[in-house]
């Protein structure tokens, strides 16, 4: 039988109420729609219960506002998230981070029933033009707004989902001139790696980028690799977990965690090419001399990659390094091109994920078996593999046509 909680004066406390022994303040705890524990504080019990009553009324008023169609996008998004009880913690944290950063303080304050297709299109263009988002980041924003509006449709708050078709329009009308296409070209790939290998500051990044370009691993999969995941005899690498970096708690400070692959396709064994093996052996010798990486994350240890502080790098730090390397290379290339009176061959802006796509493109250029490519890449949906294959082979076909046009004289 549950015991009745009482305060220091012996008065019976209601569910959720408590009195702290440290400062004798009263508190009422509740869980918000996002599953986070919240507290209401007061110096005395009477004041606390007045605050509880106001809080309960506000909750009911919020429901009335929703039913009346006067709710904001923020209100419906929070409601949507409260219903997604099966989300993994990493996914939930990423959703909240993206929403809070790009939507909550602007578009999120609009009344959802008053938003039209053109409003969404205008907001997306604002994110692209004024906030500098790339299309893939905008797609992440879209994956939050579309189901939010879809919930409002199902609850009959709005008749149609105004986000339908917006991303298709964005992709059709806005040809991105900045940034990189999905994969680096072979000359770009070589320029990037040669610059790293010959640079006195960036050379320590060579093994990691060699592994990324030589395996097609996701950045979290690569950073999470342990020595036990390598089989030198069979020349294979086991991909069975991933390193994730996401905010937790009220402070929203980010920490490293180990995450299992979302799908069965993510668990796979991939080949270890000679250059990748060389990169691993280089790191093995370095740790053998300087000391093994003893960092433990969620019970796992023996990680291959570590930074100068002895910690496992997080994905954001890798992407920041890529930006520094690109800036350094491009600055030097512009100087050299000017000296040699030629046009500079610059590296485009890209992230670690583009290196995975680059590997997949190189693989598609050599391998015709889509099932093999899908298995190596860990694609859940073969359509993803087919899209990359189509892009890679189309470029090869165009190159062949250009060579043919230069050598074949039929007139």
What do these predicted ranges mean?
Residues 243-245, 358, 377-403:
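Catalytic-site neighborhood detector that most strongly recognizes the C-terminal catalytic loop/helix
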Residues 194-205, 270, 286-295, 300-312, ...:
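Short, basic (Lys/Arg/His-rich) helix/loop patches that form interaction surfaces
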């Amino acid at each position: 039988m549950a015991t009745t909680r009482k305060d220091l004066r012996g008065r019976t406390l209601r569910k959720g109420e408590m009195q702290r022994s440290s400062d004798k303040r009263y508190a009422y705890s509740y869980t918000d729609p996002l599953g986070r524990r919240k507290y209401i504080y007061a110096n005395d019990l009477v004041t606390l219960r007045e605050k509880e009553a106001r809080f309960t009324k506000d909750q009911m008023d919020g429901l009335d506002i929703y039913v009346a169609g006067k709710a904001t996008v923020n209100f419906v998004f929070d409601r949507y998230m409260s219903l997604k009880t099966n989300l993994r913690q990493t996914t939930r944290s990423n959703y909240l981070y993206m929403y809070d950063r790009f939507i909550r303080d602007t578009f999120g304050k609009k009344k959802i029933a008053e938003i039209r297709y053109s409003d969404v299109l205008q907001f997306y263009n604002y994110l692209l033009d004024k906030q500098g988002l790339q299309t893939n980041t905008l797609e992440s924003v879209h994956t939050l707004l579309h189901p939010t509006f879809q919930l409002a449709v199902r609850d009959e708050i709005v008749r149609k989902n105004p986000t339908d078709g917006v991303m298709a329009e964005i992709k059709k009308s806005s040809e991105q001139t900045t940034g990189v296409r999905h994969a680096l070209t072979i000359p770009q790939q070589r320029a990037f790696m040669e610059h790293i290998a010959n640079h006195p500051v960036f050379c320590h990044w060579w093994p990691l980028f060699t592994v990324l370009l030589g395996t097609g691993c996701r950045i979290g999969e690569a950073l999470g690799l342990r020595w036990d995941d390598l089989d030198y005899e069979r020349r294979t690498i086991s991909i069975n977990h991933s390193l994730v970096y996401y905010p937790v708690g009220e402070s929203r400070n980010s920490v490293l965690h180990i995450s299992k692959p979302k799908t069965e396709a993510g668990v796979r064994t991939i080949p270890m090419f000679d250059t990748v093996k060389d990169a691993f052996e280089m790191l093995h010798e370095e740790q053998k001399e300087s000391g093994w990486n003893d960092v433990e994350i969620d019970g796992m240890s023996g990680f291959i990659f570590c930074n100068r502080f002895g910690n496992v790098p997080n994905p954001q730090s890798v992407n920041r390094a890529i930006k520094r390397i690109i800036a350094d290379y491009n600055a030097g290339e512009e100087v050299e091109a000017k000296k040699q009176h030629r046009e500079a061959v610059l590296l485009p802006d890209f992230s670690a994920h583009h290196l995975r796509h680059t590997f997949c493109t190189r693989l598609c250029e050599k391998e015709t078996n889509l099932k093999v490519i899908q298995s190596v890449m860990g694609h859940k949906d073969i359509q993803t593999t087919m899209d990359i294959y189509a892009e890679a082979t189309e470029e090869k076909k165009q190159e062949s046509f250009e060579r043919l046009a230069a050598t074949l004289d039929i007139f």
